[in-house]
Amino acid sequence: METAQAALYVVIVLVALALAFDFMNGFHDAANSIATVVSTGVLKPGQAVLFAAFFNFVALFVFHLSVATTVGKNIVQPGIVDTHVVFGALTGAISWNVITWWWGIPSSSSHALIGGIVGAVIAKAGIAALLAAGILKTVLFIFVSPTLGFLLGGLMMVAVAWVCRRQRPMKVDKWFRRLQLVSAGAYSLGHGGNDAQKTIGIIWMLLIATGYTAAADKSPPGWVIVACYTAISLGTLMGGWRIVKTMGQRITKLKPVGGFCAETGGALTLFLATALGIPVSTTHTITGAIVGVGSTRSMASVNWGVAGTIVWAWIFTIPASAVIAAIGYWISLLLY
């Protein structure tokens, strides 16, 4: 009885840790959702985070749990995951998020979590314990999502510039200040839909491993879904202002029309990835879209030094979080 009770306590602590990661994901990635709409002056920071948090939560009613299924069932071989693996994965992801948040670097919470899972699983059972299809799909979209965001953002900017070529700049600005509310809402919807499901996936993985949910179940318990969407929304509400300036102005100067095109390109990319069940980086996606918009003016209008720093952070995210996760896994073996 005592052993079963102790095991339950471990599960409760790990669920709380996963929700803390989800909260931090919202906090860390809030800048992605609101940077352009704040930097263009369409909304004040306080208004923007309320706006983004609302649409993060509404995503619960819009998207199927395809991403949660990928994370929960399609990355690791059945029977490998235990509480130590989940502890290591969350330790790696949270630690990397804190490091990059502190330095104001728009890293990817999503890839930190994937790196955490990979590192902890390899520490326990070796690389053969990973499911190649799920890992390759995720790794492929490390490159596809920012590229698609870049192309869609840039193409939309070119199309809008052509359509509005005979309109007065002040009139165009007025139109797109309103339209940017639509694009920011769509992007926040995509952010909530893809990112909250990653935490749903790891909690689902934990509940299957500990016998609280059957592996054959089509979806996790309802409380897991509601808790994860609530946590990411609250995190977004708290905001991550350190990163907003980097995303919204230091990469390239944005006007409302550019903000609209970047957010719409990013949102379309996220909708596609979520429909396909692919956990992507919302950070990579919106950054690619912002660079795409900036490059339509001239390549010199993009601050490639800042963009380069962000790319290096992306490159290091999965290996760094994997190493920390492996250490976390071994530490957990000493703790319980």
Feature locations, PLM:
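Multi-pass alpha-helical transmembrane bundle typical of ion/small-solute transporters
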Residues: 1-336
